[in-house]
Structures are given as C-alpha cells and as structure tokens.
C-alpha cells in the first residue's frame, strides 16, 4: 500500500468538515485540481455546505453530500455553471478515504456535490475529479457514516449533517466569496420569515369568506360596485348664461364620469399580493442586509468609543485626585450627572475598604508606600531586638523587652492591634527571644566521635624509635644537626 501513497503528489490545502458524526480532516490537491478545490473552498466561505446532510450512503462504496435540497438533484457551482472534470494520471480511486466531485452521469457537469470512498473504486477513475483525501483517525468517522441504516433508495434513515467546514490551509488567497456565511444565514432567515407571513395572510384571507355554508357557494358571483369619479366644474355660474351653463355641465359630466366595475375582494387581494411581494423582496434583498449589518457595526463601534472616552475621563479624574475641595466638587458633580459612581470607582472602593483596616481606624491615611516603609521599619526593629537578645543577660533582656512592649501598646501598632482584637487575650511572653536550641546528647554520637578520634600510629616510626635511628625528614628540617654531623666527619 505504501507504493500507492508514493505515487500521489503532495497536497497544499487542508479543511476540517465538522459533522454530527464527528470531524473529518481533509487534505486538498490545489495544484492538480485548481477548479474543483477553488469551487469547494469558495462555497465553504459562503457557508453553502452549512446544515447540508449526507443524502446518499452506499455501504462499501461511497457516502455523498453537498446538495442543500437533500434530494441529490440540486446544487450549484461557485462559477454559476457546471465546470469541467480535472483528471490527473497520479490520482486514482484505489483505496478508501478519497474525496471526489459528483456529477449527473455526464462529463464536465460538476457543481457542488462531492463523495468520499469507503473502499477502492477503480470504476470511478478517469470519470470523476479526485481533489482530496481523508487523513488521520478521522477516517473512522467516515466509516461510521458508511455503516448507517438506509432505505431502498440508499438514503440513510437518520442522515448525519455537516455543521460547518473550517478552512485550515487555503492555497488560493484571491478567492472573493459572493456572500459571506453570516449574510447567507440572514438571507435564509428573512426568506423563511417572509414565507411564513405569506402563508398566514393566505390563511386569513381564506378564513374571511366561507362559502361552503351556502347551497350556491360555487356559483356565487362576486357583486360589482359602480365606482363613479366626478369632477367639479371650474366655471363661475354668475358670469355664464344659464342655458350655456347647463349645456357645458351635461357635456363635462358625460366626459368626466367613468364607471369602473372592480370587485372589492379582487382589489384587496391584488393589494395584499403586491404588499407581500414588495416585503419579501425587501427582506431578501442582499443590499439591505449588508446595509443593516454596517449600521449595527457602526452603532456598536460608536457606543464602544463613548465607553472608552468615559473610562479615560474617569482615569484622569482619579490621577488628579489629591484631596482638594475643587476635585471633590468636580467629582461630586460628575457623579450627579452620571447618577452614581463609575465601575472603576466602585472597584477601587472595594479594594480600599479591604486594605489597612487598622490604619483607617487610627486615622492614618498615608499611601501604600508609607505603609510599606512602616512595615520595613518595624521588621528592622524586631531583627535588631532579636540580635541584641543573644548578647545581653537574660534578666536585662526581659526588662528591655517588657519596656518596648509597653511603648508599643501606648502608641502605634500595639494600640491598633489592641483595638482590633477587642478584649481578646494577647500572649505577651517574650522569653522566646532568649531561647536557645539544644539537642539531646546521644550515646551513639559519642561512640562515633570516639571512633573518629583514634590515634594513628606509624609502625615504621615506632621501629626507628626503638632502634635509635634518626628520622631523615627531621634531619632535613633541622640545620643544626646537619652541621654537627659535618663537623664530626671533619674530625
């Protein structure tokens, strides 16, 4: 099987077909089949395949989709007309998981329908355009679709549906879709709404007249009304001869009076149909849909810009806030105009209420930097106290520590902590400052030390001592002995 893969050219496009039966990962041959791949990708960009079912399943052969009508007789190409086949010598239907274009049985009749093979199908080679292949473990999702139950017409009883096709790699960056997927959805929604409105109006029109209760309902004639249109005379009666006025009046009345025999029901029906047609055309019109989308985007961007400006103004006010009366007045007036604090001020108020409760109770409104400096100062004092406690006698240390604790209780952190605890018993024992860590003496440790402290005796040194021979190393290190030996030789 590996030699079959080796003969196929490299792919340059990739899509993922998201279906109700799972994802199907497809790689496309855009170089070998440019028209088929371009048609498939363009229809995908337009959302043409969204919601389309697999209308044909032949176990052991193919599964087929791409018809929005779901009958197998529909579909259109991106080019507006069927396009020709693209047969390549190295692309053959010799295994499962190959993607091809479906046609109506004749050559060069490709539109939007496609199929995926479930096994080798050599009878399709040189008759259908093969423009892609299934890769990875997603082939098993294709096989699951191929195992569905079908009726006599090879239609699955519960047909799976394509949710959407995601384009991962597009070899043709110059594709400009005729309509976007969002616009297509809006157009279809408008069509359905217009169709529902038309059906409801037809039902209402039929319900108004019930001739079934009359014995002559079928042969009832629609009553006719004579509609007369009269015009007033534009002459002055006091300046015209009476006989001549009567003559002209009768003449003009004959010319101006027109009798139009129009049944009222036909009038209403014609008007309603004209209104329905105009409303449906208006709802489905693509230009109106695009204009509406642009208006919604413009309105959303304007509201977003207004919110950004408002947030910037709030930030400027917070930076300038220094506790002055003018700033407080401007803030209060702006809050009155906004009918409440902004979101940013509310969040800052939450954090301010949680931060430094003891400092707020004592009336201390210093900034965060001052608080950090105070904390560091207290830590330095504490470390200094601990260091001094190790050098002084225990009695003096206890007295100094008690004095320091008394001072802290009078002012500063000790008072704030006392107020905060509200009568809770405080542990004021300061003996731990002079405490020393002492480990229990272990017999095993003493034994180990005794073993390590054994004296090492050199037997050669002991032998020299017994024989009375001098040590060469000692002689080298003592020059007096050397001179004595030399003087002895001279004698």
Curated annotation (Swiss-Prot):
Keyword annotations: Coiled coil, Cytoplasm, Isomerase, mRNA processing, mRNA splicing, Nucleus, Rotamase, Spliceosome
All copies of domain PPIase cyclophilin-type, residue ranges: 11-167
Coiled coil: 277-327
Biased composition, class Low complexity, residue ranges: 323-333
Biased amino acid composition, Basic and acidic residues: 186-202, 268-298, 306-316
Any Pfam family hit: Pro_isomerase
Record field: compositional bias (Acidic residues): 391-406, 418-427
GO BP: mRNA processing; protein folding; RNA splicing
GO molecular function: peptidyl-prolyl cis-trans isomerase activity
Cited InterPro entries: Cyclophilin-like_dom_sf (IPR029000), Cyclophilin-type_PPIase_dom (IPR002130), Cyclophilin_A-like (IPR044666)
Described purpose of this protein according to its UniProt entry: PPIases accelerate the folding of proteins. It catalyzes the cis-trans isomerization of proline imidic peptide bonds in oligopeptides. Involved in pre-mRNA splicing.
Annotated family: Belongs to the cyclophilin-type PPIase family. CWC27 subfamily.
Name the UniProt record assigns to this protein: Peptidyl-prolyl isomerase CWC27
Species for this entry: Cryptococcus neoformans var. neoformans serotype D (strain JEC21 / ATCC MYA-565) (Filobasidiella neoformans)
């Amino acid at each position: 099987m590996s030699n079959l893969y080796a003969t196929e050219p490299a792919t340059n496009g990739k899509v993922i077909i998201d279906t109700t039966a799972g994802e199907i990962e497809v790689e496309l041959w855009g170089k070998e089949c440019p028209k088929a791949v371009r048609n498939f990708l363009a229809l995908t960009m337009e959302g043409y395949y969204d919601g389309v079912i697999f209308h044909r399943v032949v176990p052991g052969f193919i599964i087929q989709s791409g018809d929005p009508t779901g009958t197998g007789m529909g579909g259109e190409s991106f080019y507006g007309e069927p396009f020709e086949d693209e047969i390549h010598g190295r692309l053959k239907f010799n295994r499962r998981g190959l993607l091809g274009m479906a046609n109506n049985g004749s050559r060069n009749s490709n539109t939007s329908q496609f199929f995926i093979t479930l096994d080798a199908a050599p009878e399709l080679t040189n008759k259908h355009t093969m423009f892609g292949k299934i890769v990875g473990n997603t082939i098993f999702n294709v096989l699951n679709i191929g195992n569905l139950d079908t009726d006599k017409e090879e239609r699955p009883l519960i047909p799976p549906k394509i949710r959407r096709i995601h384009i991962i790699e597009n070899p043709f960056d110059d594709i400009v879709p005729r309509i976007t997927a969002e616009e297509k959805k809006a157009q279809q929604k408008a069509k359905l709404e217009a169709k529902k409105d038309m059906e409801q109006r037809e039902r209402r029109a039929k319900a108004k007249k019930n001739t079934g209760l009359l014995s002559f309902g079928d042969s009832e004639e629609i009553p006719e009304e004579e509609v007369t249109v009269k015009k007033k005379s534009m002459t002055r009666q006091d300046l015209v001869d009476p006989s001549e006025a009567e003559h002209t009046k009768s003449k003009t009345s004959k010319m101006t009076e027109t009798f139009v025999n129009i049944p009222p029901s036909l009038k209403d029906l014609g008007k309603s149909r004209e209104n329905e047609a105009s409303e449906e055309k208006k709802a489905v019109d693509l230009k109106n849909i695009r204009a509406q989308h642009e208006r919604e985007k413009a309105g959303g961007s304007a509201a977003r810009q207004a919110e950004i400006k408002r947030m910037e103004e709030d930030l400027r006010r917070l930076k300038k806030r220094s506790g002055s009366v003018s700033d407080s007045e401007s803030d209060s007036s702006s809050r009155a105009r906004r009918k409440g604090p902004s979101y940013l001020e509310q969040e800052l108020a939450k954090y301010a209420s949680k931060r430094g409760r003891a400092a707020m109770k004592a009336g201390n409104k210093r900034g965060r930097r001052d608080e950090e400096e105070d904390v560091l100062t207290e830590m330095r004092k504490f470390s200094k106290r601990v260091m001094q406690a190790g050098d002084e006698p225990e009695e003096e240390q206890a007295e100094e520590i008690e004095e320091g604790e008394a001072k802290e209780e009078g002012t500063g952190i000790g008072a704030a902590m006392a107020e905060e605890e509200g009568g809770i018993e405080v542990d004021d024992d300061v003996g731990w400052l002079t405490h020393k860590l002492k480990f229990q003496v272990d017999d095993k440790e003493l034994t180990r030390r005794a073993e390590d402290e054994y004296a090492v005796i050199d037997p050669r040194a002991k032998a020299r001592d017994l024989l009375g021979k001098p040590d060469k190393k000692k002689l080298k290190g003592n020059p007096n002995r050397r001179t004595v030996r030399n003087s002895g030789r001279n004698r």
